[in-house]
């Protein structure tokens, strides 16, 4: 018995699909632009005396001038103190940059994963790790903030996003990163979002 009949049909909104595709392309382009900027900035890092305190690229948002070293030291110490006050053991730092926080927090932890989309930054931190026994347990990944591939769910007690989210292309990307981060965070763990620029 052939009892076929049409019960429903869908007409895709081609304009909405085009907008979504354009939005995804825009996201990719923006992330790519930031990556290029940081690759170029970080590649100027060879002449640094204290490789664990490389503040290249930390510039005043208004003047474009480099931030004074003493201000940066105070900011780093305060940030590290805040994070260490939670007594972290298994840490994921998304956007570890040149290791300002990593080099100070990782020695106090059992596990420390650092990710950054800049290969130059990851290579720089990898070289730093090779010179310090207290950092030998650090695992580095060259990847974008939304890539959590190979990381166990509910493994980390602390996830750090410091001076990172203002470079995300939009709120959807931020929400995607946060959703994935929460999956990797142990119940009762800490998500540290720091140094968020105020655009108001």
Name these PLM-found stretches.
Residues 1-39, 98, 141, 146-151:
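AMP-dependent adenylate-forming
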Residues 71-90:
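Conserved alpha-helix/loop element of class I SAM-dependent methyltransferases that forms part
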Residues 98-109:
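Conserved SAM-binding loop of SAM-dependent methyltransferases across substrates and taxa
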Residues 111-116:
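Conserved SAM-binding motif I beta-strand of class I
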Residues 118-120:
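Conserved SAM/SAH-binding beta-strand->alpha-helix loop
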Residues 125-126:
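Conserved SAM-binding loop
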Residues 150-159:
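A short acidic, Gly/Pro-enriched loop at the edge of an enzyme's catalytic core
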Residues 175-190:
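A short glycine-rich, Lys/Arg-flanked "PGG" loop and its adjoining helix->strand segment in the class I
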